[in-house]
Design a protein with these regions (language model features):
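Glycine-biased, small-residue-rich flexible motifs in mid-sequence functional cores and linkers
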Residues: 1-152
Length: 152
């Protein structure tokens, strides 16, 4: 783990998205990210897809806590991209990796481990989009519907 490990003890909203996102959902995701940022809500996500990366950018413009879950090995402290170092130093960003530290590139298996980690460690789940036939939807079997929100 890199960053403030006490963030794991906070109430968290998990954000994930299917790869295919309807254009109408994009602005809803940006608005949601802005609202979470302004309300100071701790958001946990993989932030891998372009939409998820945009959401991370919106979130890091605020001061609320963010937990970034990688599906690959962690960076070394020096290897963390400069855009994220200030948030780590300020104690509002935690970067974790629940996968083997030998994994250098994300694959379907490591992405599934990451997504399961986000779902298991967040109190509510928000999806930018959710393909009913996709892997994310399959992971939600047995999860209470009142814990799930789909934006698009």
């Amino acid at each position: 783990m890199l960053g403030n490990t006490t963030l794991m003890t906070l109430p968290k909203v998990g954000f994930l998205s299917s790869r295919k996102v309807p254009p109408a959902a994009v602005m809803k995701c940006y608005d949601w990210a802005t609202e979470m940022r302004d309300r100071g809500v701790c958001v946990m996500g993989g932030f891998q897809s372009p939409l998820e990366r945009d959401v991370l950018t919106f979130l890091l413009q605020g001061k609320q806590p963010v937990i970034w879950v990688l599906a690959r090995k962690l960076w070394t402290p020096r290897g963390v991209p400069k855009a994220y170092r200030a948030a780590i130093e300020e104690g509002r960003l935690l970067i974790v990796s629940p996968v083997s530290q030998s994994i250098r590139r994300v694959d379907a298996q490591s992405a599934a481990v990451r997504n399961r980690f986000v779902l298991e460690h967040s109190d509510r789940h928000v999806f930018g989009s959710l393909d009913p036939n996709g892997q994310l939807a399959k992971m939600l079997e047995g999860v209470s519907q009142d814990q799930i929100q789909v934006l698009g």
